[in-house]
């Protein structure tokens, strides 16, 4: 069974097929996989690593966009984002206030790799003259996590080794979604942190 929605194997489905499946998490191309793909497509072992890294940073590693013309890549990423939003979040959870969901995900995308809390988003929404509860925000974030669109990195007290429940960091399954939305390279440190975080997940770290 495959799909973008992790709930496919987490709730009632996991109960139905208990003991009959092995879950494998599939992520977008790593940089190493991206290089290998380019070599195979161009039928050469000679590549410009610096040039390829710039391309990888700018557009991400989603496999479907690799054969799309450069001028259409952001648009294609936008289509993927809208599909995840519609099928895996809005439709599945019967969300009516889709604009509010969009604003919350915009905030998360804009702040990848930064510490923030549900309270931070409440203030952000309030600044726009609107209201939303922390519980609703936490629900929306959970839906996005279950759709494998975002991943949460909790803070840990190094001395006590306790997980801190406030000001977590969130990362995107693919940094290309940030670039497609904002197209800015000035936040390079956060984009690189996102790349490293997903690579750690890819290697089995939680």
Predicted regions and their residues:
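Interdomain motor-coupling "hinge/lid" segment immediately C-terminal to the ATP-binding subdomain
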Residues: 4-6, 10-115
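Accessory nucleic acid-recognition modules appended to NTPase machines
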Residues: 70-206
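Glycine/alanine-rich phosphate-binding loops at beta-alpha junctions
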Residues: 1
């Amino acid at each position: 069974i495959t799909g973008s929605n992790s709930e496919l194997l987490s709730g009632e489905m996991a109960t139905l097929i208990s003991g009959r499946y092995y879950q494998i998490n599939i992520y977008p191309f790593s940089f190493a996989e991206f290089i290998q793909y380019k070599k195979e497509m161009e039928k050469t072992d000679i590549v410009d690593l610096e040039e390829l890294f710039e391309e990888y940073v700018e557009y991400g590693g989603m496999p479907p966009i690799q054969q799309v013309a450069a001028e259409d890549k952001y648009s294609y990423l936008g289509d993927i984002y809208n599909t995840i939003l519609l099928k895996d979040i809005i439709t599945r959870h019967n969300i009516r206030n889709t604009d509010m969901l969009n604003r919350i995900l915009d905030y998360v995308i804009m702040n990848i790799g930064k510490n923030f809390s549900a309270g931070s988003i409440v203030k952000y929404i309030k600044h726009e003259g609107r209201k939303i509860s922390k519980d609703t925000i936490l629900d929306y974030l959970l839906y996005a996590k279950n759709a494998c669109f975002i991943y949460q990195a909790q803070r840990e007290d190094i001395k006590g080794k306790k997980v801190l429940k406030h000001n977590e960091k969130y990362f995107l399954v693919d940094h290309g979604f940030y670039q497609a939305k904002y197209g800015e390279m000035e936040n390079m440190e956060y984009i690189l942190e996102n790349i490293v975080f997903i690579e750690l997940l890819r290697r089995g770290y939680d």
